[in-house]
Amino acid sequence: MEKIGIFVDVQNIYYTTKDTFGRQFNYRALWKILSARGQIMTAVAYATDRNDESQRKFQTALRHIGFSIKLKPYIQRADGSAKGDWDVGITIDMLQSAADLDRMFLLSGDGDFDLLIQTIKIDHGVPVEVYGVPELTA
């Protein structure tokens, strides 16, 4: 049985799914599909912490499914822009996990991960499958 890892860019998946389909992404269905493909060794959801009750409920639901949650503070800048980017954290975790996995799944439409995916494939021989909203995936 393949050892698999799941890495989720929660903000990216939330907004692209909501904008395209008008609803939330079904993490329970994803877990069912991927757990049928192998043994899930690690599953991490990377999110921002806005200290919001609905977000805490969502994070609790993800934990019940089997995800561990990594939170980064949500920073609202004076100019109105926001910061809560997990690209570097996801990259580090995937690179550190690659030697222990047979297959990786990245949920994000962020094109910045292309070099990471190629590095994992070349240096570790581990295939990385990307899940994202096709119209909004770079």
Residue spans of the language-model regions?
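Acidic, metal-associated active-site segment
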Residues: 90-100
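Active-site histidine-anchored catalytic micro-motif
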Residues: 99-138
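Short, well-ordered alpha-helical scaffold segments within catalytic/effector domains
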Residues: 27-28, 87-92, 114
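Domain-level signal for Mg2+-assisted phosphodiester chemistry and nucleotide/NA-binding surfaces
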Residues: 1-86, 99, 127, 134-135
